[in-house]
Design a protein with these regions (language model features):
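Bacterial N-terminal signal peptides that target proteins for export
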Residues: 1-8
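Bacterial N-terminal signal peptides
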Residues: 8-16
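Kelch-like beta-propeller repeat domains
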Residues: 19-322
Length: 322
């Protein structure tokens, strides 16, 4: 099922890009904070609002908006060992604001929008990539079509959180990969889109996000326990932001970039569970939003994104070593 995205929401989502501003946020950053960033070979096609995931030691960047502000079906794969990008089979349709995750060695792209020029259509599609055949196939559709959602992999399941159709949602649906079946579970306490999510130590963490482009930005951290179908509140981020990326590495969670109205972020934060606090790490060299993050061999890759509020697709490929 597809539903047309309201024109008012679409206009709000792109308003910042129409202003043509490039203003970095005053987010708390410390250039001397621990961690090291390195720039690697850029993507062939600059894109933002991308879906990003790691599979087989490589980084996949799927869909998004190009510099022409039109959605694309492009899929590029980055090999950190050779510092080379290559194109693989495109998505079945152009998609932006989708989310991606790998569950039990299988790569899925979930939801998003298709269409451009303010004529966005919400999607409930689920596509699985088969690397041995270099093909995509459709799977059981998500019950609630939405874009700007986040997904997290945990225990053989994919958790789809939040997003928006005509407004921000607190919808929470779970995909059982083996059964190819969706179910609804306890919704998030806070309705939001453009959030990030990770599976971490048996829980699903929902991080940041926003009510709308010009509305409330959230620092909220909400933690879901699948065993009890319950939520609890975690320590909030140091700064409220939507359009951020997140990754779990070892016993830490990292968040990167994002935007607030008319501002973009370079801030990197790390959750240290030993002190139950988010601490500043070295900021991204290039402030961006509409990004994703993927972990390969102890490093976190953050490709693409927008350099300005709204539209400003970048081909940047930066890697963080904690």
């Amino acid at each position: 099922m597809k539903r047309a995205l309201g024109l008012a929401l679409a206009a709000a989502l792109v308003a910042g890009g129409c202003l043509g501003l490039r203003v970095e946020s005053r987010a708390p950053t410390d250039p001397d904070a621990p961690g090291q960033w390195q720039s690697r070979t850029t993507m062939t096609w600059g894109r933002q609002e991308v879906a990003v995931a790691a599979l087989g030691g490589k980084v996949y960047v799927m869909g998004g908006f190009s510099s022409t502000r039109e959605p694309v079906d492009i899929v590029e794969v980055y090999d950190p060992a050779t510092d080379v990008w290559r194109a693989v089979a495109p998505l079945p349709i152009p998609i932006h604001h989708a989310a991606a995750a790998v569950v039990d060695g299988r790569l899925f792209v979930v939801g998003g929008y298709t269409g451009g020029r303010l004529q966005w259509t919400t999607l409930g599609t689920v596509f699985e990539y088969e690397p041995t055949q270099n093909t995509w196939r459709g799977r059981a559709q998500m019950p609630t079509p939405r874009g700007g959602l986040a997904v997290a992999a945990l225990g053989g399941r994919l958790y789809a959180l939040g997003g928006a159709a005509d407004r921000a949602m607190n919808t929470h649906e779970v995909y059982d990969v083996a059964a190819d079946r969706w179910s609804s579970v306890n919704p998030m306490p806070t309705a939001r889109d453009h959030l990030a999510a990770v599976g971490f130590e048996g829980r699903v963490w929902a991080l940041g996000g926003r009510e709308s482009f010009l509305g409330t930005q959230y620092a909220n951290v909400e933690i879901y326990d699948p065993a009890t179908d319950s939520w609890r509140t975690g320590t909030p981020l140091a700064s409220a932001r939507g359009g951020l990326a997140a990754a779990a590495l070892g016993d830490k969670i990292f968040v990167f970039g994002g935007e607030a109205p008319l501002r973009i972020w370079s801030a990197t934060e790390m959750y240290d569970r030993t002190i139950n606090t988010w601490v500043a790490k070295a900021p991204m060299p290039t402030a961006r939003h509409g990004i994703g993050a993927a972990v390969v061999d102890g490093r976190i890759y953050v490709p693409g994104g927008g350099r300005e509020p709204g539209f400003a697709a970048a081909d940047v490929n930066e890697v963080f070593t904690p």
